[in-house]
Curated annotation (Swiss-Prot):
Protein family (similarity comment): Belongs to the universal ribosomal protein uL18 family.
Top-level taxon in the UniProt lineage: Bacteria
Claim: Thylakoid is one of the keywords in the record: no
Record-given protein name: Large ribosomal subunit protein uL18
Gene3D superfamilies the record matches: 3.30.420.100
Organism: Leuconostoc mesenteroides subsp. mesenteroides (strain ATCC 8293 / DSM 20343 / BCRC 11652 / CCM 1803 / JCM 6124 / NCDO 523 / NBRC 100496 / NCIMB 8023 / NCTC 12954 / NRRL B-1118 / 37Y)
Subunit structure: Part of the 50S ribosomal subunit; part of the 5S rRNA/L5/L18/L25 subcomplex. Contacts the 5S and 23S rRNAs.
Database matches in InterPro entries: Ribosomal_uL18_bac-type (IPR004389), Ribosomal_uL18_bac/euk (IPR005484)
Pfam assignment, any one: Ribosomal_L18p
Cellular-component GO terms for this entry: cytosolic large ribosomal subunit
Length: 117
């Protein structure tokens, strides 16, 4: 019998491999993206201190619409909250997800609103 590989296990494996190579600092934090079936989350993380500097998610009150529209608004929010914390340059961590759809929408929106990566 053929067994299908668990997609989330493969994603976590990719994410761990990438996390071994990238790390965020206070000057250039890591923009981490987590995507669930219903929601999307973004965090600016300083890996040296182990601190989240800013975060945004589709749970925030001002985020409504379809999943892709929510991702765009979360990108806008994380960019504005990053600017408030005096952060412009980030390292994008797609979390092992394919750079497509909601992950791409969030990244493009964050770029358009002032984050550089």
């Amino acid at each position: 019998m053929i067994s299908k590989p668990d997609k989330n296990k493969l994603r976590v494996k990719r994410h761990k491999r990438v996390r071994g190579k990238i790390s965020g600092t206070a000057a250039r934090p890591r923009l981490n993206v987590f995507r669930s079936n219903a929601n999307i989350y973004a965090q600016l993380i300083d890996d040296v201190a182990g601190v989240t500097l800013a975060s945004a998610s589709s749970h925030d009150a001002e985020v409504t619409g379809s999943k892709t529209e929510q991702a765009v608004k979360v990108g806008e929010l994380i960019a504005s909250r990053g600017k408030a914390a005096k952060i412009e340059d980030v390292i994008f961590d797609r979390g092992g997800y394919v750079y497509h759809g909601r992950v791409q929408a969030l990244a493009d929106s964050a770029r358009e609103n002032g984050l550089k990566f």
